[in-house]
Amino acid sequence: MSITTKQFQKETDLNPVWDFMVEIYDREKGGGVAAPFFEYALFSSWMDKSYVHLNRLWFDGSRVVGFVFNEAPVTDIYFKIRPGYEFLAEEMVDYAMKEMPDFDNKQRFMLFNGQEYLMEIAEKRGFTQQYDYEDRQFDFSKELNCELPEGFHFVKDADADPLKLAKCCWYGFNHHLDKGEFENWTAEDTSGEWTPAVSYKGILEDFRNPPPHSTYEYTVIIADENEEYACYSGMWWVPENHLAYMEPLCTVPQHRRKGLASAALTQHYRRLKPLGATHMTGGGDPSYEKIGYGKGIHWYCYARHK
């Protein structure tokens, strides 16, 4: 056994990290987030990439056995460890505490069922649990059958419009409440703030240069009678894990509580179950339970009070 480390580099390490996270994915035992979680954030326009170079990989020979990384905010730290290499956990925790972002003492460890040994180490280092929640999944042994309401239709993948999608996401994620209306989306923006221009630029880049493991052909977009986008549900299909990884999901305010999100999830179910999918991700909102979502992965947030 020859353990070495290196700092993450997007150009060379993206595929090894994806393969590693796919290989150790365990729906039953847990052990952390699925592979799309990291790549989706890394290629997003909403994540601060300034500290990606602090992400670190552990290798046994040429085989990835551990990975520490951040997401958004940059002070949220995640761990992935290959089974059999749990002995690296203390070293990985110490590295995270010493080298990864901890601005204003806000560093948090985002841990999961199957990572109880990491929780014990974190507690010894002065971390305490702040909250926890169940990130629910839908088991495809059950049927999902929520039809599209009258007056709405699915948009063909080839017809997807990045500007309409940017507008849908702006209002669907309630950015208008604190950042104003969706305007000036073509303006040059160097403010560093989340603006319509930044949002539109990010989605346009996704259309032109999608992340390498993305499967945008399975994205679901729902439009109203005026061809305005009302609901958007992204999809990363991971056949090796039989996983339909749904991210993100939003509905514009004027069309909420009409069953659009449920219809979008049903469309994913109908497309991907024949391909071999056995389960689909969702979230912690109670609305998922109402349409049949059940046990998924359990999040535990740990932080220190200095």
Regions found by a protein language model. Give the residues of each.
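Acyl-donor-binding surface of acyltransferase catalytic domains
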Residues: 71-75, 83-152, 158, 299-306
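Short, high-confidence coil segments that cap the C-terminus of an alpha-helix
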Residues: 53, 104, 217, 274-277
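Conserved donor-binding loop and adjoining core beta-sheet/short helix segment
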Residues: 6-14, 24-100, 224-225, 230-247, ...
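Conserved acetyl-CoA-binding loop-helix of GNAT-fold acetyltransferases
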Residues: 86-98, 251-253, 257-274, 290
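Conserved hydrophobic beta-strand within the GNAT/NAT acetyltransferase core sheet
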Residues: 107-111, 246, 279-284
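A short helix-loop-beta-strand connector motif used in the catalytic cores of GNAT acetyltransferases and
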Residues: 42-57, 61-63, 190-201, 208-221, ...
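Short amphipathic alpha-helix that is part of the acyltransferase structural core
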Residues: 1-40, 147-198
